[in-house]
From Swiss-Prot:
GO terms for cellular component: vacuole. It is found in: Cytoplasm; Vacuole. The gene is salarin. Glycans are attached at N153, T184. N-glycosylated, with sialylated biantennary complex-type glycans. O-glycosylated, with sialylated oligosaccharides. This is Cystein proteinase inhibitor protein salarin. SUPFAM superfamilies: Cysteine proteinases.
Amino acid sequence: MKSLVLLLLVAVTVSSVVSKPLPEDSEAEVHKEFETWKVKYGKSYPSTEEEAKRKEMWLATRKRVMEHNTRAGNGLESYTMAVNHFADLTTEEVPKGLLPMPRPEEEEVDKEFEMWKTVNGKTYNSTEEEARRKEIWLATRARVMEHNKRAENGSESFTMGINYFSDMTFEEVPKGRLMVVFPTRDGGEEAEVDKEFEMWKVQHGKSYGSTEEEAKRKEIWLATRTRVMEHNKRAETGLESFTMGMNHLSDKTTAEVTGQRLQDREEAEVHKEFETWKVKYGKTYPSTEEEAKRKEIWLATRKMVTEHNKRAENGQESFTMAVNHFADLTTEEVPKGLLPME
């Protein structure tokens, strides 16, 4: 696989020598890296002014490479990049045909970071500092995106967001996570909260079997709401690096949410097993309806085999069974003579 290098880089193989500077490198280490790069590619300049100009371009290239590779490390890019002998050239100076097209998603992430900096008034003392901060920001962004995907799938009871502290490590975020105490609700506020709950129910299609069940669920919802509000208050004052929100699991207990996650995980595992079985036996179906029907039969066969093998483990059966290429067929469809004797 080749490492595609954006702007001032050409394609090089992953196995080639890749510069791996760390964001926290000191100025002396970066200078040493530049000198090593010059020797490697036989670089020399006619004046100190020219060298300073070329070093600035090299630093900009190095920064882009580091940012890209950080995204690649977080799974946001499908390839890595490296610094090569064109790293001190402008886009116009690089020979035509050697510049890859910019990736739209990469441009979008860069634009998002720049907008975030503007909104939050962020400036940095050096390109190295900005690269380090962007790396942390990207990691926070990836974590928030992953969390929110789980929230969309019902595996989390709240959503998260990016805020002012998203370029800081956990150690750098101001300490003192004090619980925010909310004032007792008066009649007007209580009516607003009741209205909010009713709107939430409509939004997520919630209905309950009895007034007792609704009262119970509302209590859980209120506790979730309080926790989210307290967290977001801390986020506003800089004690958290992300914000939270309500979703369709906000009326469930932690145990119920965890149980849902387990159920979702088990269903995903069984689905993966079915897909693997289809590939193994070359199974395809003419329609989604037919596949759904066959999967139901396969699931019933799988259940029967699993139960039988549990009995075999306990000494209640003298043999074990396995799922084979007939597992999506009914008893009538299996060729005669291939079914075990009763």
